[in-house]
Amino acid sequence: MAGFMKRTMSYLGMSDVVPEDEDDEVIDEEPESSFDTDRSVTPIPAASTQPSTSQRKSVAPFHANINRITTIHPQSYEDAQLVGRALRDGIPVVLNLTDVSQSQAYRIIDFSSGVVFGISGSIERVTERVFLLSPARVDIVAEDTESGMSDNLFEN
């Protein structure tokens, strides 16, 4: 019955063609070593899930001491990397986009917004084309959210 299925599958193109003389031939191969019988590998004892008392260390809460804020005046989109590097290092950035065209400013804000999102930080608009970007560990307290600025980044 198995020979019939092999020939049918071969005829339909669903398997390799098997010559008739090789169909019933038994091939003697060396028995493969079983994984269970292979003793070349020695088991490693499982690590304890509970740390020993000597391994425990006290963890103090991290309180950021902000001693620097970077101001960046990009001249082109390539300068946006400076924003990413500063934020990655935990330094708040004041981003002044007054020296670039509006299309370049949109691209820089788009890149900077992605970086801020990636580090779980925040972005606040200070004026029409000046923004404060801060890492996650820096809290920004806005004085007046009803200052008359629209939700659009570049319009009043």
Curated annotation (Swiss-Prot):
What are the boundaries of the region Disordered? 15-58
Q: Which GO terms describe its biological process?
A: division septum assembly; FtsZ-dependent cytokinesis
Task: State the GO CC annotations.
Answer: cytoplasm
Residue stretches of biased makeup (Polar residues): 47-57
* Record Gene3D superfamilies: SepF-like protein
Cell compartments where the protein resides: Cytoplasm
UniProt biased composition (Acidic residues): 18-35
Q: Which UniProt keywords apply?
A: Cell cycle, Cell division, Cytoplasm, Septation
What does the UniProt record say this protein does?
A: Cell division protein that is part of the divisome complex and is recruited early to the Z-ring. Probably stimulates Z-ring formation, perhaps through the cross-linking of FtsZ protofilaments. Its function overlaps with FtsA.
* Known partners and oligomeric status: Homodimer. Interacts with FtsZ.
Instruction: Name the family the entry cites.
Output: Belongs to the SepF family.
HAMAP family, per the entry: SepF (MF_01197)
Name of the protein described by the UniProt record = Cell division protein SepF
